[in-house]
A protein has these predicted regions:
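Helix-to-loop junction immediately C-terminal to a conserved catalytic motif
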Residues: 3
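A short, proline-enriched helix->beta-strand linker immediately N-terminal to the Walker B motif
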Residues: 100-104
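Conserved ABC transporter NBD signature motif
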Residues: 11-22
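Catalytic Walker B motif of ABC-type/P-loop ATPase nucleotide-binding domains
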Residues: 106-109
């Protein structure tokens, strides 16, 4: 509902002061990329540019090439189909498509899922670089504690079908809810916090 893909069951979602008509202002990266298998990477990125902005295919392909470069993919990746890509390349291609319309807000669903620790750390750094360079608001869903500690300014914890807390990571981690304590202070949580403290 937040990204505008589903209607809310109750109430309304307001983004940038509007409840509708913000599709051009947001980019979405789906957990598994959701690239069209019959289109090349370049065509996947150019598609929303052509459809939503009415730009010519030639110009859209030029813009797509820039987005490909921004995400660290080699230029020749634009001519590949999703089936030809590694998991990390799919994430970057999907991120390039999410950036296609120069959004103000990026919605990312499990952006580091399926990546090895080195690839996930590289992706986190890429997200932070893009966020800072383009003044993006990044809204992400993740279970990756390293990503939380590396890339998040504020955290909302959802458990038992409700929001338990929304605050900075330090405040969230200190919350006295049993589930939160287990999540943030278990072995993986402690390792992620230690790693973040060393960085």
């Amino acid at each position: 509902s937040i990204a505008g893909l589903l209607q809310p069951k109750a109430g309304q979602v307001t983004i940038l002061g509007k409840s509708t008509g913000v599709a051009r202002n947001i980019g979405v990266l789906f957990q598994r990329g959701a690239l069209f298998s019959s289109l090349t990477v370049q065509e996947n990125i150019a598609l929303p540019i052509i459809e939503l902005l009415g730009i010519s295919r030639k110009k859209a392909n030029q813009i797509a090439a820039v987005k490909i470069a921004l995400t660290g993919l080699p230029a020749q990746a634009g001519e590949l189909y999703p089936a030809d890509l590694s998991g990390g390349m799919i994430k970057r291609a999907a991120l390039a498509r999410a950036l296609a319309l120069d959004p103000e807000i990026l919605f990312l669903d499990e952006p580091t899922a399926g990546l090895d620790p080195i690839g996930a750390a590289d992706f986190d750094r890429l997200l932070m670089t893009l966020r800072d360079a383009f003044h993006l608001t990044v809204f992400l869903i993740t279970h990756d504690l390293d990503t939380l500690y590396t890339a998040c300014d504020r955290v909302a914890v959802l458990s038992q079908k409700k929001v338990l807390v929304v605050d900075t990571l330090d405040v969230v981690a200190a919350t006295q809810d049993e589930w939160i304590k287990e999540y943030f202070h278990g072995p993986r949580g402690r390792a992620a916090a230690l790693s973040a403290a060393k960085a």
